[in-house]
Amino acid sequence: MLIPLLALAALALVPTGASAQNPWLERRVLNIAHQGGESEFPSNTLYAFKRSVRAGADMLELDVGVTRDGEVVVMHDTTVSRTTNGRGTVASHTLKRLRKLDAAYWFAPGRADPYRHGLKRAAYRLRGVATGKRRPPRGFTRADFRVPTLRTVLRAFPRTPITIEIKARTRQEETAEYVRNATVLAKALRDVRRRDIIVASFRQQAVDRFHELVPQIALAPGIGGAASWLLAGGSPGAGVAAFQLPITYESGGQRIPVTTAENVVRAHREGFAWHTWLSDDGESVATWRQLIDQCVDGVMTSRPVAFERTLRAHSAPAACG
């Protein structure tokens, strides 16, 4: 099985004009801390980002929403109730109100579902740090456990690559909401000179809108662009530097393979990097090793500390380049 896989990977080493200009193809395999590593640390907090980078993460993945007063903040869900002690949507809160919330309130480390509500109080070991009811771990502050602004994260990690996913504003997740948030994000990043940022969204319209306003920042395609490339051999869209896709997509009750050796080879040949996220497929050492052997350029993992151990023990095949 590995021999044909390596043969396919060797084809990806043929240089093209596009690949020569894509810095995201220059390093493999990136340990990308999804939400900062939400299975090991409280989702999308400065504490999570700092811990994952110290453990060896090469890149941070985070999600952004927009507050009622127009501030870009880092939060995975459109609502705050799953991870914090608050209620309502991100869009219904002002930044001042959002900053009072405890972003580690429902984090119970060491569990299959680390954000399960209703456990014994002792399970939520970091609850109260943000509000001053518990002393922060050594080397950290109360602010590391609150909802951060995107500006704060960029300032805290000036040399760590970051991928930013645009979220919606309500539970209905209308396309217009994504486009609006893309517009606000573009304004926030318009004068940023960094070239180690990738912007993504499930909605292609949001990605396209962001590119219209800030064409110098790299993109990952939405579902529309990815489907065009995967199913019809078309373009994934302007400004795309990397695919950020799962191992499989579920459609009609069936799992359709997406991250395959053939697709990774094709992406590399056409000058695109390939980052795989694992939320719907589960994470294991066996899965991580499979992805490394397929020559993916990055793995978006909820367990960056554990994944780093696998990376150190299992290198990408020489044919990956």
What residues fall within each predicted segment?
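Secretory targeting and sorting signals
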Residues: 1-20
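Phosphate-group recognition and catalysis centered on beta-loop-alpha active-site segments
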Residues: 17-321
